[in-house]
């Protein structure tokens, strides 16, 4: 069985001029995954990471204790190892420049949602960590700037997630396909378990919070009805599956075929998910696995972000299902 460490070394060897910086970042993320995995598995035995922290994040959302733990774990691991020039998190208002000699000379910045779906942890539902890595655009040797983080998603050099479920998996891409590694706690290593993952071009699963139906755009309402209608030629009706954790829903749909939708709504007209921390990394993974991702109209990876915590509607998953949803969005446009 090939380990994540072996896989990283093999891939680095394919690029003779590579100096190992990206490999070092992935190694840091591997450590973060192990630490968060350890504490999540003890969540029911301690009050230290369960429940609300009483603190609000920059979006005005109440942070769970585990949000803060995951955020601080990720941040500290990156600071200690000095593998990146800067760090931005969904849980922190501003980016952090690692203003040390090694940090200023690092080539990459990382953006992260340290713990997606954290409200589920109290009831033992799978949660995840999402990450996105870019090559900085500011001069090497200087502190990073906001422009290093405000890059369109097609400029990502790597992205992935860690899902903490019945097993812990690290799934990532560096632009050459998607591979998944399952954690073996008895050995303390991630082993290659899902090589060259491909999203089926079509599927039978649609994932959306139907409790918000009345607030959705007409195109989304019509697509939901389409999914529910009986039609032998397209093997409908489809199955509704919604966990409430982007990582978990995306992971299932990537393996089985399906579409995940978090649209705009009357209560959040620009969408609710964050472009830089959730939309871009999931879109990069989807495209690398043969799927697509859009905001209902345009390709997610082509959007030029204007601010660090910008929100976006997200339609992501099997190619044919996303295209069909886009058809409904165009046909029933409310502009």
UniProtKB/Swiss-Prot annotation:
Where on the tree of life does the source sit, at the highest rank?
Answer: Bacteria
Q: What class of enzyme is it?
A: hydrolase
Q: Where does substrate bind?
A: 116-119, 209, 242, 272
Per UniProt, subcellular location reads as: Cytoplasm
Alphabetized SUPFAM superfamilies for the sequence: Carbohydrate phosphatase
Its pathway, per UniProt, is:
Carbohydrate biosynthesis; gluconeogenesis
Family (UniProt):
Belongs to the FBPase class 1 family.
HAMAP family attached to this UniProt entry: FBPase_class1 (MF_01855)
What binding partners and quaternary form does the record give?
Homotetramer.
* Name of the protein in question: Fructose-1,6-bisphosphatase class 1
Instruction: Specify the species.
Output: Histophilus somni (strain 2336) (Haemophilus somnus)
Q: Which gene encodes it?
A: fbp
């Amino acid at each position: 069985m090939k380990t994540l460490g072996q896989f990283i070394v093999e891939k680095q060897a394919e690029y003779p001029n590579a100096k190992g910086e990206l490999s070092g970042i992935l190694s840091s993320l591997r450590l973060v995954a192990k630490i968060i995995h350890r504490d999540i598995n003890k969540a029911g035995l301690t009050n230290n990471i369960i429940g609300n922290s009483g603190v609000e994040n920059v979006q005005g959302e109440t942070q769970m204790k585990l949000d803060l733990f995951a955020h601080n774990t990720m941040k500290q691991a990156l600071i200690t190892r000095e593998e990146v020039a800067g760090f931005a998190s969904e849980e922190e208002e501003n980016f952090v420049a690692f203003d040390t000699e090694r940090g200023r000379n690092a080539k990459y910045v990382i953006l992260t949602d340290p713990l997606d779906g954290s409200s589920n942890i109290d009831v033992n539902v799978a949660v995840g960590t999402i990450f996105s890595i870019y090559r900085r655009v500011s001069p090497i040797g200087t502190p990073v700037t906001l422009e290093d983080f405000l890059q369109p998603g097609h400029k990502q050099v790597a992205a992935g997630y860690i899902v903490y479920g019945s097993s812990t998996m690290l799934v990532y891409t560096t632009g050459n396909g998607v591979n998944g590694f399952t954690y073996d706690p008895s050995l303390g290593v991630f082993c290659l378990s899902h090589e060259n993952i491909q999203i089926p071009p079509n599927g039978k699963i649609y994932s959306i919070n139907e409790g918000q139906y009345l607030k959705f755009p007409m195109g989304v309402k019509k697509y939901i009805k389409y999914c529910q209608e009986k039609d032998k030629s397209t093997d409908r009706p489809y199955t509704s599956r919604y966990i409430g954790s982007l990582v978990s829903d995306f992971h299932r749909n990537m393996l089985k075929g399906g579409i995940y939708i978090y649209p705009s709504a009357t209560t959040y007209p620009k969408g609710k998910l964050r472009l830089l921390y959730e939309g871009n990394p999931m879109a990069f993974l989807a495209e690398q696995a043969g799927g697509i991702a859009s905001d209902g109209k345009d390709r997610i990876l082509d959007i030029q972000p204007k601010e660090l915590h910008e929100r976006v509607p997200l339609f992501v998953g099997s190619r044919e299902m996303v295209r069909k949803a886009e058809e409904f969005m165009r046909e029933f446009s409310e502009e």
